[in-house]
């Protein structure tokens, strides 16, 4: 019997997409997050967004708050909040957002003066953040009328108490508000463990640096990847690999770009929670060109 060529062509056309699905796994394409604000020589916020390398920019830091303290923004040499000249960044925030870049307010940092003394204190801080940086209203918004996309918890001092209360209070204003956290890689994190366990954080960008037991060191990726695998079982909805953008950006844990793209990313991208790479920080990235070197592999 002679085969019907028209039917064979139709069957082939139907099977081809199935073959592609069978032989090619879906790609976990990710993005790059960066911290901006702690070096006056790193360029403007708009400069960072105009590189086209970043999907998230964390404005660092709201470094004083809680315990009855007057909240203070610290943007190093960029502006002086005490004379209300940081609102110059309002239009730049909107420009970044127009490029589909999420802009967040980062809380804390390594040297800030912050703490939460009670659940009520957390609620008061949440009210301040909502009214001054997010969708609420205040006559003294430090960054002008721009509405940020979310809040990042970079809590590196004090206790781990009441950060979960702060997360709940912020999500209570808007369930779509983006919440992110930047814990250290040792598990459990000394400050954010309870907060992360709420499951309220959309992204957790873990700091895999300045922590020798769980970072890259001298050609050894085993400790780093082992720690990553442990983090995938956390309540984080999405995980980013946090790394220094240059050797000068951190005391230890720098991963050469070629090692990251050839040895680390191919392994961790197999995780369904993989979201991308977080860089500390914009200044060091500008000096090293790290994001440009890795973006094609992230």
UniProtKB/Swiss-Prot annotation:
Belongs to the glycosyl hydrolase 18 family. Chitinase class II subfamily. Residues 30-298 form the GH18 domain. Induction: By ethylene. The lineage of its organism: Eukaryota, Viridiplantae, Streptophyta, Embryophyta, Tracheophyta. It is found in: Secreted, Extracellular space. One of its GO terms (molecular function) is endochitinase activity. Residues 1-29 form the signal peptide. GO terms for cellular component: extracellular region. It comes from the Eukaryota. Its EC number is 3.2.1.14. It is an enzyme of class 3 (hydrolase). Disulfide bonds join 49-96, 79-86, 185-214. It catalyses: Random endo-hydrolysis of N-acetyl-beta-D-glucosaminide (1->4)-beta-linkages in chitin and chitodextrins. Keywords: Carbohydrate metabolism, Chitin degradation, Disulfide bond, Glycosidase, Hydrolase, Polysaccharide degradation, Secreted, Signal. This protein functions as a defense against chitin containing fungal pathogens. The active site is at residue 156. One of its GO terms (biological process) is polysaccharide catabolic process. Pfam families: Glyco_hydro_18. PANTHER family: ACIDIC ENDOCHITINASE (PTHR45708:SF22), ENDOCHITINASE (PTHR45708). This is Acidic endochitinase. Its main location: secreted.
């Amino acid at each position: 019997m002679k085969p019907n060529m028209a039917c064979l062509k139709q069957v082939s056309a139907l099977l081809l997409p199935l073959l592609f699905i069978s032989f090619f796994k879906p790609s976990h394409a990710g993005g790059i997050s960066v911290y901006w604000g702690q070096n006056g020589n790193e360029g403007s916020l708009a400069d960072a967004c105009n590189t086209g390398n970043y999907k998230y920019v964390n404005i660092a830091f709201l470094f004083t708050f809680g315990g009855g303290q007057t909240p203070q923004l610290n943007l190093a040499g960029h502006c002086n909040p005490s004379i209300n000249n940081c609102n110059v960044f309002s239009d730049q925030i909107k420009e970044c957002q127009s490029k589909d870049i999420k802009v967040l307010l980062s809380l804390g940092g390594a040297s800030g003066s912050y703490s939460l003394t009670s659940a009520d204190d957390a609620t008061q801080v949440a009210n301040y953040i909502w009214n001054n940086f997010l969708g609420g209203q205040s006559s003294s918004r430090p960054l002008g009328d721009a509405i940020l996309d979310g809040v990042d918890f970079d809590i590196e001092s004090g206790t781990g108490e009441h950060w979960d209360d702060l997360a709940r209070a912020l999500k209570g204003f808007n369930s779509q508000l983006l919440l992110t956290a930047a814990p250290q890689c040792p598990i459990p994190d000394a400050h954010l463990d309870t907060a992360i366990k709420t499951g309220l954080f959309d992204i957790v960008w873990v700091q895999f640096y300045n922590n020798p037991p769980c970072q890259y060191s001298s050609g050894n990726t085993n400790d780093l990847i082992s720690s990553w695998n442990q983090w995938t079982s956390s309540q984080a909805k999405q995980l980013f690999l946090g790394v220094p953008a240059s050797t000068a950006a951190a005391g230890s844990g720098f991963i050469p770009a070629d090692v990251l793209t050839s040895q680390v990313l191919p392994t961790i991208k197999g995780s369904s929670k993989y979201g991308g790479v977080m860089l500390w920080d914009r200044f060091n990235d500008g000096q090293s060109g790290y994001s440009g070197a890795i973006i094609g592999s992230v």
